[in-house]
Amino acid sequence: MPLDPGCLNGRVMKCLTFFLLLPETLKKSRKSARAQGKVQACYEIVPLALKKKMAAELYPASANTNIANSNAAANAKKNALQLQQAAPPPPQLHNLNNNNIESGNWQSFHPTLRERNALMFNNELMADVHFIVGPAGASKKVPVHKYILAVGSSVFYAMFYGDLAEVKSEIHIPDVEPAAFLILLKYLYSDEIDLEADTVLATLYAAKKYIVPALAKACVNFLETSLEAKNACVLLSQSRLFEEPDLTLRCWEVIDAQAELALKSEGFCEIDLQTLEIIVTRETLNTKEDVVFEAVLNWAEAECKRQGLSITPVNKRNVLGKALYLVRIPTMTLEEFANGAAQSDILTLEETRSIFLWYTAANKPQLEFPLIKRKGLAPQRCHRFQSSAYRSNQWRYRGRCDSIQFAVDKRIFIAGLGLYGSSCGKAEYSVKIELKRQGAVLAQNLTKFVSDGSSNTFSVWFEHPVQVEQDTFYTVSAILDGNELSYFGQEGMTEVQCGKVTFQFQCSSDSTNGTGVQGGQIPELIFYA
């Protein structure tokens, strides 16, 4: 059986080590001999038996030591080296199976400190402690390296190297989700942030708990980017819990502008009672009060289910507590109250009677509900023309599309359009308005408006305000059907400053009726910011 080249190399190294140490050994031996009054011979230092043993290790009797075999060993070593040099580059961090180091010389394949640290992520190699992460029955055992965690988090530093440092080999963390904890560790080991929608809140909790502000900020930015009406109420609740004022402010922007969508979302029914009270108290909710009342009832039903209570009017009142009396029921129209709250059974007979009397009687009874209507949000208007004009032979509607593209430098909510009407007296128009982004329709509405013959603009609204992101071009269109002669805008501007928002305009290929940047229809964009 031929000798393994690896074994041969090992024995050569032993011999080489011996000869490197030989001069020092000779010096020590001579000094010892002088001290004893005699000089030792070299054969006493290197006995013949030892020489034979070393020779046997280098060239065992079972091995063929002819030149051909030596050349074969050299060739094998050369081939192994070539294979090593031709090895593929190390895989990306997220593909690493970190409990299977690829070779005994793995350090040479990872030239940077970050790569080498990243290879240790979730790796048993050199791990000096384990975390048991997650609740009992759903926990995960995670290997970690104290030093890496300690240099990335003051909490971990205190845990491992502080005055009250943990000495256990396993540390239990039942309040953190395993997936979120691994995202935290991946950042500490490699600076990589790999966030996902279904774990970002749990990751934010972990980042806050272990004081890793860069990861916490990344989580907040991720949440702000994904924020929309259907999750705004839940994120508001979480932002208050995590004390993230910027995220809280963004949540309020969405909830105020898209209040009806937010209150009708499933997420609204998942919030805590305190957040419910804060939302219902909000002065700037941009919706009708019967929508608020219906949302509160839906929340009460969901809360009864969470508490294991039967869904009855009494239990709904009990779980709501004072929140019921934050709804501004008297600000509904009489019709809205009669068709909604009065038939809900959650109000007592006395409360229902008193509210009806408040609507109709000269001597109004005192009510426990707020009487003042919410202010809502005041819409803002971006006017893109400096003047308007009318020429009988120039601007007509024939069911063609008027369209313009726009972009903004901060997030806003487009609520509708301001349009020119007839230049020949009072007239009614049917109109279809549309908002698109990169060809995808975000909102549209088919409605009517009446113009009075003046050059004023007339508002046409989308069903719900639409969130518009910054630095992206959107297309608004209007197709009018009615009196053919109309006012039109002149001296159009490519850039308009409107409050804190800057609008940019450019022509749209969808426009087939002559509207462009310099003139035409769609003089105003109506928005909330």
UniProtKB/Swiss-Prot annotation:
The entry's cellular-component GO terms read:
cytoplasm
| Domain called BTB: residue spans | 127-197
Query: Is the keyword Cytoplasm assigned to this protein?
Result: yes
Q: Does the keyword rRNA-binding apply?
A: no
Which keywords are on file for this protein?
A: Cytoplasm
Compartments, as annotated in UniProt: Cytoplasm
Q: Which InterPro entries match?
A: BACK, BTB/POZ_dom, BTB_POZ_BTBD6, PHR, PHR_sf, SKP1/BTB/POZ_sf
Q: From the UniProt annotation, give the residues forming the signal peptide.
A: none
Job of this protein? Adapter protein for the cul3 E3 ubiquitin-protein ligase complex. Involved in late neuronal development and muscle formation.
Name the UniProt record assigns to this protein: BTB/POZ domain-containing protein 6
Gene this protein is translated from:
btbd6
